[in-house]
């Protein structure tokens, strides 16, 4: 098969090697963000107001109701919000009604409830000018879970937990003596019968009648020392509130509020759904033997005989009757916690693990509890206890906590709703208090409501929650992946330290829901995942994946798509996407490879229920961009997927010759491109904007409508300092459809994702320069700017009010020559377009110095003649080390001009410096298969090996990097790329359905290349051919964000730590290089005594010595003797602080006075130690404040 041509967007055709026709289009890839937030605005907010409304005061006289809400227009647009460092938000107004029940007076008011952050069209939020993403969280679903474990004696014990969304936990467990215990809210355990008595089943006989007679229950009753409901309630109260005097009334109220009060206990709709599903009677009846005859209550007809086995058919016959309420029993408990009847559904069966088959057990379901009952009910508790006893008798299943049917997603909407709930409940408290304090006649809703707690809760969530993250904006793919990320960490989730191996592991239920490949390396592995390409999230927060329905009558695979959750999928047999089908959609082969509950099985074709939609439904968007993924080892594929996210946008991006067909969709949905919103005709194309005149249909004719103007981003700094720039790809007069790409974003080429460049690669060694994965590169790639990228850095200077007077931004700076001021304008701010080097002035700023107290005469003179002698010091903003470049833009914000600035700031200046970074030695590069390396040598073109036609190679990679890493995909890509380049084609080779080995050999033949894809190479230095033929081809290589310019660092003097007086560490602190323990050993081994002494004293923490040494070097004198290092003094002081009498003695046993060493400090010249202000001091967590400023 030679593949067929497929169109991607307006401008690109690719030859696709896909064999499987896809029935389903890819969904919008950031739908998980946008639809969740939309739900919150439409439903979530309304739910919250309904939950707390009405608020009544303690006497029940005043009542405050929330009727409706509306969101106004945002104050700033997205662009303005970014520029002004404000939040992109809209005002939330709520219609509130206050009712005075005594007078019958009703007051209605619209109350402003704060600005609510809005989501941009691309699924992000702008908070204080920074673009942030709310990551979805994977948590345990509220439900009831049963688990078993074998103890040290080999006895199987069971435990169960009822987990609510919020509220007290209820746990059951067995011990070695077969007694069943319950724990309420993590307290000490009680026999489970105590809880049943508290619910109103006071005597032993009632409990036995309810649950059925069995030895576990008998053991528990023996252990139980209460014999009535009152005693049970008191017992529970003493456990939950130790030390308080128990009364019956208090005990009842406590239990009622813990479990049966909707405000204190919430299962959420998902918890109710899961509990009803788990405790329903039907799952436990399947494959069991009935111990009673089941009769239709209306017709008295026998549906199932006692002793009959319940198979699938009998169960299906029973189901309608079970739903009607066969076996429903209503208990009227005496004086329990709850008033009213308890209805449960009971059916008797024979215990399957009884050797005689005579023992009868009760199977109890929780009756029929409506979906909107969000708290737990007594029926739930009884049914969950019954399930526990059933498990002991071999009926029912334990749960796998890592199964995706038991884990759910909290997306943006729900996370926000939870925060909003916290804010509202705090506000509710305030409202109640104000109701009782203020005068009831004159009060208005506005006076009652304090919106501060609501605003604070929302602000706190967006500003400091673990799940609200600064968007990774290195390139469009990084952006897209960040929005589709699923994290198991965060509040209410796991912690890195506690998470075991099982949670992190790939589970069979991840198939089509979560990517098994894309996850970070390191401590977060498996805790942070990525959503698969086709996955969707249902209303309960479970991830669903699409399957094609197989028609059971005809055996044909239909085009009907069903989205299944993980626990629904467990009931079906699912065939792989690559199963061969006939023309009419039936399976060609009698036996089909399929999956059932994590087992890969071969089944007869009539047993298949569903079929995969596409081979790439298993993996995430980033993984689906790796061609020949099927030929790579998964560990390397993981690195490949992660490194694509670190690709720096290049000056001239180029789409991969060998792609997967995902490039177009990923780029389009990422939010980096400009997408057309309505069908229309392009009227005008400029670098900065595109005008599209809408075409609308009126009476069957197309007429011109409104004009849409699309603004393009030009050289904007992204969150990561890369350059975001958009370029139009449409022409004037083009007719564009809705959803078409009008302009490429960064790392895009003709609407496709283009993270790197296609270069000519040879797998060969060259003088050992590609040892350990190093890369040798041709100088052509430097000269022709193939791997040149643009980086923009932002620097800020602000003038504040200080105690001694305001700071001033000015050109007039003390002790600075005219030469240093040449690039500053009259305001003292650098001009746009100036070329600046490290240490140059960007913004001139002076701060008033502290002055001595003036005498009365001096003060009088000052008042008359004005302040002449004001002492100021230079606090200008300078270019930090490695930050030189060209000034791209300057933004000035003034308080006088009405700009919103933080308190105490009068003026804020932002300077943007742009750098053009060519590729250089030390930069990190990678392919898409996890084949990464650092450039070790850039050779002149003439020294590079060349092909027989004289073309020099661009890059040489080490062939030893392939076999042990098992990422053979790169070799396929190399050969296929070579052939495609020759034929002038672009190729799409989708994951798991791409070009085969045979296809690659065929296209090589078609391109007229050698069948083994190797070629003779000639040495550029000598012109001689190399001994063996070499694999040469086109590979897609990307430049990663780890650039040598950001890592190179040197220091002579700089800041020192306060306590030890040693230099700080790290580039961000402008620190020194650590000469560690092992390095000291090395010098000791060489006997290099003077070097060693110097390193341990004057170069490190001998305070006096280092000043004197600096002086000596400057004056050209001999370097003096070192003194005592500060760390030694610290050690002595620490020993003395432990109460030890430690003194230092000289060689002739004279005591050395430590104080003498400090005397010299006073004479140390001030100006010697240079204080360097690091640009990113905030990022340095280590010793942030511990800097001595000399």
UniProtKB/Swiss-Prot annotation:
- So which domain of life are we looking at? Bacteria
**Which residues, if any, are the signal sequence?**
none
Location of region: Disordered: 1155-1190
Q: Which reaction does it catalyse?
A: RNA(n) + a ribonucleoside 5'-triphosphate = RNA(n+1) + diphosphate
The UniProt entry's GO CC annotations, sorted and at most eight, read: DNA-directed RNA polymerase complex
Top-tier EC class: transferase
Give GO terms: molecular function aspect only.
Answer: DNA binding; DNA-directed RNA polymerase activity; ribonucleoside binding
Nucleotidyltransferase listed as a keyword = yes
The UniProt subunit note reads as follows: The RNAP catalytic core consists of 2 alpha, 1 beta, 1 beta' and 1 omega subunit. When a sigma factor is associated with the core the holoenzyme is formed, which can initiate transcription.
> What name appears for this protein in its UniProt entry?
DNA-directed RNA polymerase subunit beta
Q: Organism classification, top ranks?
A: Bacteria, Bacillati, Bacillota, Bacilli, Bacillales
